[in-house]
Amino acid sequence: MNPKDGTRTRRFKHVFLDAEGTLYVPRNGMSRWYFWARPTPEDAIRFFELDKGVIAALEKLRSEVDTLCLVSLNSEPVLDAILDHFDLRRFFDEVMVNGNKGDRIARYLKEHGFSKADSLMVGDTPGLDLYPVVKAGVHSILIDRDYNRGHAAERIKGVYELPAWLRVADIAENMFKERVRIATLDEFFCGDARTVNCTKSLIAVSGA
């Protein structure tokens, strides 16, 4: 689906989202391993809840990117139960399950004639959502979680921040076509984003 603002140069046109830990999380901060010890579709809809602002973010993304896909390693019965229970399936062009996420995304992009340079993966698990995807040549950022803070990566606090992050990326793309340095999402909106303290790398630059 094409964005409403057709005059804006967009840094990322094709967005791929992880499922568990990105769109939905265990209720009341419970460990996911309580569920995965004996997973069933029926228990899944009781154990998990949508993360903060997910529906509003997906609605916004659906109107601003060309492609929105879900890439998950959850078992299909569990994933289907959650997608149907929370009415999430309507937002996605395709739901991809199983396999190396980097390979799956690269294959999807090739089949549809899309560029890796225009694509973004968002997830919470570095070993599944970050490293294999980056290795495949696709940019990836992490949802900030306690369990992934030992890994160096660009981060957002949740999917609810993704539309704003993409907007900053668009601004950066319009301002600097070759090399980009701009404030982080929080600092971009601070009172003095031009100071040294308010200047950090947000958008990865080819060759940087």
Predicted regions and their residues:
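Conserved phosphoryl-transfer catalytic core
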Residues: 30-44
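Conserved phosphate-coupling serine/threonine residues in phosphotransfer and NTP-handling enzymes
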Residues: 72-74
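Asp-based phosphoryl-transfer active-site loop
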Residues: 11-27
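Short beta->alpha transition motifs characteristic of CBS
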Residues: 25-31, 145
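Asp-based, Mg2+/Mn2+-dependent phosphohydrolase catalytic module
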Residues: 1-15, 36, 47-49, 53-55, ...
